Amino acid sequence: VREEVMAKWTPDKVFEASGVDEATCLQVARTLAENRPSTLVWCVGHTQHTIGNAMVRASCLLQLALGNIGKSGGGANIFRGHDNVQGITDVGPNPDSLPGYYGIAEGSFKHFASTWGVDFEWIKKQYAPGMMTKSGITVSRWIDGVLEKNELIDQESNLRGMFFWGHAPNSQTRGLEMKRAMDKLDLLVVIDPFPSATAAMAAMPGKAEDANPNRAVYLLPATTQFETSGSCTASNRSIQWCEKVMEPLWDSRTDHMIMYQLAQKLGFGTELVKNFKMQKVRGMDEPVPEDILREINKSVW
């Protein structure tokens, strides 16, 4: 925390920005300073705010300044704000880990090759040379993967395609740059029960110099949690099974059906579902959710 930056935040400026008066601000500051270690906990009020990224970073900086990081009773702790956010995090969407938070080293891939029953060399061939064990780009920095000069990016080409799967950029702080990046893509896919803010942003008119006339945008309707069954994991890692309430509406499909159909088109559908029973849903093959959970349990617990 730089002193010259903090010096600008006088009590009147804090009140102007936050609505918290000087007396209350001083009381909170004194309470935090005199009761250490302490933990800071937040949910979607922080993360899905219009400046969510900045607020989370500020929270971490506050805890660092107070000396509350890395000790029992301290920490900057986020509670999951929606149903099964913990569950999806557990199965490996982060750019620097595999399911179960295994690192992206060859040994981890060999573990999954063994538990999935697929050949490690086959997995290796699915990646460009050197990319299998290299961290990807985070959700808040994919913009740079499109807009930065290629020599500043640790891969052969800039990003050309993006999938927004159950995610919208409302809480990202770089909206104008994100719009430019979206317009430059070759492919943009939005998978959600409803057209999201991503779809709305993609449809907004942008600058002519940023527009890619050959860009393809696809909206794939996914089911809600009521139109499928599956497990939900809470912040405390407890697991609850949720049963299907109704059949999928209109043209919507479950996430695992969409994944399977994409894998078929890309040539590895057989490998993806080799450990799953398949069931028919509206005449289409879909992996049985219970089998997916069994494979997760076998692989990461």
PLM-predicted stretches and their roles:
Residues 1-72, 78-301:
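Non-catalytic alpha/beta scaffold blocks inside enzyme catalytic domains
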